[in-house]
Swiss-Prot record:
Keywords: Exonuclease, Hydrolase, Magnesium, Metal-binding, Nuclease, Nucleotide-binding, Nucleus, Phosphoprotein, RNA-binding. Binds 2 magnesium ions. The keyword Lipid biosynthesis does not apply. Belongs to the DXO/Dom3Z family. Residues 253-256 are annotated as: Adenosine 3',5'-bisphosphate. Adenosine 3',5'-bisphosphate binds at M185, D236, Q280. It comes from Mus musculus. Its main location: nucleus. Residues 1-30 are annotated as: Disordered. The lineage of its organism: Eukaryota, Metazoa, Chordata, Craniata, Vertebrata. One of its GO terms (biological process) is NAD-cap decapping. It is found in: Nucleus. This is Decapping and exoribonuclease protein. Its cofactor is Mg(2+). Residues 1-10 have a biased composition (Basic residues).
Length: 397
């Protein structure tokens, strides 16, 4: 659900003073996997700080009203036989992807809870605030061969904020999205409708509208290396029967994929799709991904559960596989790179980190539109209520 960013191609803006402060020793960051193959870095077990919901009109609510509950078909019953094409396009209300939400929903949550954060407001001054999806892209970067990305970064009251910008290539691809791909996107949401109920112990109702404006989001705290993190991500459902009832350990991620019939197909699945599933679920501490495998007619014929902590075992002995240590080490390196690059505390100043497959991460500096993303209502309220804080948390925070 993490929002995409601006739509216009960047025009480099003259910002003399900030440009002079860019560190000259580290102008770019390389991304080759071999550079990040060291031991797995420290990653603090994610803890949930709170949640919020977005309704059918994409309006924010600081509660769990949009949370759904995992309700799979009986284990000993017949196969699932879910028709993922049912209701398309008549009962489909997709989110308007032209609307640039940036970090706005997460920032509203931060405003409402800034005085209740564990460790006090001083903790936030040393943290990085972003969406889980942005971190997922960083984790998979060393192995990504097709899609580049851009991340806008601003420092305000000590906190580093990261917000994705839609690249021109991604925008062109989205606007030219073929009908089959649009239908496949619908199928993923339809699968959730077959697997989730509105209350614990309830039954799914796949007859209703699929509205992708609706979302339940968890807000989490963690730390990667010496980088405190506050991030949010959409949660598909909560499992009332989970051994641990404390979020995020009771959350379940739902996915769909085409049926596999050969070892080669499974090998490709493990190398590519499972990497993204792992990154997306490992970051927030979601323990299981439940996948529905669909046939060419769009029916789910089988379900399979992938424990997040066991996904790497499928590629451990594959020379062309991925390594979690590489993913996390690169993410930590990027955070260090960003923290040392974005040194000026100014919500109107943006460092744009850009990456294309095969190249390094590069940086350009911009002021105000079109890249500035911290809204005035957030900046003004934080400035009035909390004076700029210089305290940086210790690595053990």
């Amino acid at each position: 659900m993490e929002p995409r960013g601006t739509k216009r191609k960047a025009e480099k803006t003259e910002v003399e003073k900030p440009l002079n402060k860019l560190p000259r020793a580290v102008p770019s960051l390389r991304t080759q996997p071999s550079l990040y193959s060291g031991p797995f870095p420290f990653y603090r077990r994610p803890s949930e700080l709170g949640c919020f919901s977005l309704d059918a009109q994409r309006q924010y609510h600081g509660d769990a009203r949009a949370l759904r509950y995992y309700s799979p078909p009986p284990i000993n019953g017949p196969g699932p036989d879910f028709d993922l094409r049912d209701g398309y396009p008549d009962r489909y209300q997709p989110r308007d992807e032209e609307v640039q939400e940036r970090l706005d929903h997460l920032l509203r949550w931060v405003l409402e809870h800034r005085n209740q954060l564990e460790g006090g407001p001083g903790w936030l001054a040393g943290a990085t605030v972003t969406w889980r999806g942005h971190l997922t892209k960083l984790l998979t970067t060393p192995y990504e061969r097709q899609e580049g990305w851009q991340l806008a970064a601003s420092r305000f009251q000590g906190t580093l904020y990261l917000s994705e910008v839609e690249t021109p290539a991604a925008r062109a691809q989205r606007l030219a999205r073929p009908p089959l791909l649009r239908e496949l996107m619908y199928m993923g949401y339809k699968f959730e409708q077959y697997m989730c109920a509105d209350k614990p112990g309830g039954s799914p109702d796949p007859s209703g509208e699929v509205n992708t404006n609706v979302a339940y989001c968890s807000v989490l705290r963690s730390r990667l290396g010496n980088h405190p993190l506050l991030f949010s991500g959409e949660v598909d459902c909560l499992n009332p029967q989970a051994p641990c009832t404390q979020p995020p350990s009771c959350y379940v991620e739902l996915k769909t994929s085409k049926e596999m019939h050969s070892p080669g197909q499974w090998r490709s699945f493990y190398r590519h799709k499972l990497l993204k599933w792992w990154a997306q679920s490992f970051l927030p501490g979601v323990p299981h991904v439940v996948a529905g495998f669909r046939n060419p007619e769009g029916f789910v014929c089988s379900l399979k559960t992938f424990p997040t902590m066991e996904m790497f075992e499928n590629v451990r002995n594959d020379r062309e596989g991925w390594n979690p240590s590489v993913c996390m080490n690169f993410c930590a390196a990027f955070l260090s790179f960003a923290q040392s690059t974005v040194v000026q505390d100014d919500p109107r100043l943006v460092h744009l980190f850009s990456w294309e497959p095969g190249g390094p991460v590069t940086v350009s500096v911009h002021r105000d539109a079109p890249y500035a993303f911290l809204p005035s209502w957030y900046v003004e309220t934080m400035t009035q209520d909390l004076p700029p804080l210089s305290k940086t948390p210790s690595p053990k925070d």
